[in-house]
Amino acid sequence: MKFSELWLREWVNPAIDSDALANQITMAGLEVDGVEPVAGSFNGVVVGEVVECAQHPNADKLRVTKVNVGGERLLDIVCGAPNCRQGLKVAVATIGAILPGDFKIKAAKLRGEPSEGMLCSFSELGISDDHSGIIELPADAPLGTDIREYLKLDDNTIEISVTPNRADCLGIIGVARDVAVLNKAPLQEPEMAPVTATISDTLPITVEAADACPRYLGRVVKGINVNAPTPLWMKEKLRRCGIRSIDAVVDVTNYVLLELGQPMHAFDKDRIDGGIVVRMAKEGETVVLLDGSEATLNADTLVIADHHKALGIAGIFGGEHSGVNGETQNVLLECAYFNPLSITGRARRHGLHTDASHRYERGVDPALQYKAIERATRLLLDICGGDAGPIIDVSNEATLPKRATITLRRSKLDRLIGHHIADEQVSDILRRLGCEVTEGQDEWKAVAPTWRFDMEIEEDLVEEVARVYGYNNIPDEPIQAGLIMGTHREADLSLKRVKTMLNDKGYQEVITYSFVDPKVQQLIHPGAEALLLPNPISVEMSAMRLSLWSGLLATVVYNQNRQQNRVRIFETGLRFVPDTQANLGIRQDLMLAGVICGNRYDEHWNLAKETVDFYDLKGDLEAVLDLTGKLGDIQFKAEMNPALHPGQSAAIYLKDERIGFIGVVHPELERKLDLNGRTLVFELEWNKLADRIVPQAREISRFPANRRDIAVVVAENVPAADILSECKKVGVNQVVGVNLFDVYRGKGVAEGYKSLAISLILQDTNRTLEEEEIAATVAKCVEALKERFQASLRD
């Protein structure tokens, strides 16, 4: 936002220079991007009047003038400006004047005619780039007055970056409030007395979308002269804010926008059919905007309409059909409060970004509309004449924003600032900010002002107190760096160690958004309830993820579309599961997930092209699980997951608790997500694995180990892991190793059965095992398998 320093000082005038003012504004949180003078460096330029203006005898495009600058005689000046004419008040650079660029004015002859000065344009004085003609001053400009003094050119343009939370500073009044608070100076608001209605004319106004438009004010002003010139003082203020003067009506609404931060619009009343209706657009409805472009609207766009058609996009852009033109005599002034959510994103959808939409998207003061429409009415009547009717007010108090009541605790204030500010100072700061303050025992209750809708929680008040008190006034404290023993335990398994192992196995870490497409998430987790964002970045990022698979699979598709068919990626991050028992109704679980697809190895002349399968991913996952020391307690059990292939997937259990899933992506899901070929995924709840089992040293047996192999026939649906687990349990004191080394199906084994060849390693730490003991242990294992799984020894 750009504004004139002198305009700001009309509202509040602290006894500090421009540099100090700019620094103060920056320290207050409104970063100053630049301070530039409004005009170039010049002197010797005064107000003059063209008394005579005749054609140059030797040049078609030059005029010979006699100019009165308040001296003893008239000056002869040759001028080539097309708008030079008799009776015009102008800016005259007299002999001896120095203009920007160190250009000195001297007496000269132009095509044989003497010239004792120069009639100046805005560009020649370094005021603007306008060189279309000489400056035209008001008829009452006093002759001989220094032009710098008359136009108040000893001024600066200050440009600031306004953060989204400080929308109240998108008007002079907001910046002035902050400067007044920081300097304990009075805020001198211009007189904005109500304008008495002199006519009774009104217009029917209906608000059908009260949630989107809680307040809409209108006022009829009749008999205006739309061609009346905008006063030079207003043009200059607008120019110094970067706004070009258009016509008196538009200039007035722009002036109020810059002064109060309240967007306004003026309709040609005679072009409104029936009355004003504030409603949501009809799907596909069109409106021709003031710039001549046609916008096709969606049903979620708020429009200002009459009884037959849309007149403009509410809070963004007016329509051409109802706009003010050179023949307008009667206008309807509009001043409204629109809910920011009803405006946000609509302008960008149509490739627009206007001063109005910029403010409405961030929010305007919901109590400002009366002041703004009275201010605009008075300015319009003073410039264009006419008669004003009464204000038409259509408000819905139930949908207007309510002022926040916030409790500020002394303990919280001192802890966050790190410095004690006296109670009296805290109360004074809050009141100067516009809050209604009630002091309590070590606390304050503050009702935020209507223009500070960013004040919502206790931390906001702490920030405001520190900002106004002055960060530079908070004393530096030496850092307390006492020696603190680390909390790391040997049993802690860091994610960094896990990530390093996955990196060593060829995986690359990715970070995806926690916001995902709800449609894609429903494909992966059908029927699952997700947390939906009330104000998402986009529709495709409007749900919080229930797992990391949504982002990982989207990343795989992205890479496959760029000819990267061999992908190995992993991610660690939070998933967000709605849970009424959790804090704030949402459970956040730290997850570890990975995806692989494509060939097992990079292309190589000595390696066959083999596509990855379930056991490739399972092997990598078991290597990770082995870091926890809990691999022996891990089981892979057949369990349905709608996102995974029913025959090539498993649930992962730690003892009796499920901690994740692994498997091939379901073919139907693979098709819907446009995945190219077999894709395998896994996901683990990491918090259930983060504590590793620390290896315990034990005595190495000095006695020989004995191996015995058995082959048992079991039903096809019996997991081999259960067989191995049972063998370990039965021979707990002597069986030190169990391994599955062969699986056989075929001749000699009945249909629906399989043969598992298992090696048993038996050993004792205190003695050599006798053959009878070994045989008894093996027989015990076989008997246990027979009893539990109906296993039989294979012949």
From Swiss-Prot:
- Tell me one GO molecular function of this protein: ATP binding
* Coiled-coil spans in chain: none
Q: Quote the PROSITE patterns the UniProt record gives.
A: B5 (PS51483), FDX_ACB (PS51447), TRBD (PS50886)
Q: Name one GO cellular component term.
A: phenylalanine-tRNA ligase complex
EC numbers listed for it are: 6.1.1.20
Q: What keyword terms does UniProt attach to this protein?
A: Aminoacyl-tRNA synthetase, ATP-binding, Cytoplasm, Ligase, Magnesium, Metal-binding, Nucleotide-binding, Protein biosynthesis, RNA-binding, tRNA-binding
Catalytic activity of the protein: tRNA(Phe) + L-phenylalanine + ATP = L-phenylalanyl-tRNA(Phe) + AMP + diphosphate + H(+)
Which biological process annotations from GO are given for this protein? Answer: phenylalanyl-tRNA aminoacylation
What intrachain disulfides are recorded? none
Tell me the InterPro entries matching this sequence.
Answer: aa-tRNA-synth_II/BPL/LPL (IPR045864), B3/B4_tRNA-bd (IPR005146), DNA-bd_dom_put_sf (IPR009061), Fdx_antiC-bd (IPR005121), Fdx_antiC-bd_sf (IPR036690), NA-bd_OB-fold (IPR012340), Phe-tRNA-ligase_IIc_bsu (IPR045060), Phe-tRNA-ligase_IIc_bsu_bact (IPR004532)
Q: By its UniProt entry, which Pfam families does this protein fall under?
A: B3_4 (PF03483), B5 (PF03484), FDX-ACB (PF03147), tRNA_bind (PF01588), tRNA_synthFbeta (PF17759)
Q: Where in the cell is it found?
A: Cytoplasm
Q: Where is the B5 domain?
A: 401-476
Name any cofactors this protein relies on. Answer: Mg(2+)
Q: What is this protein called?
A: Phenylalanine--tRNA ligase beta subunit
Q: Origin organism of this chain? A: Salmonella typhimurium (strain LT2 / SGSC1412 / ATCC 700720)
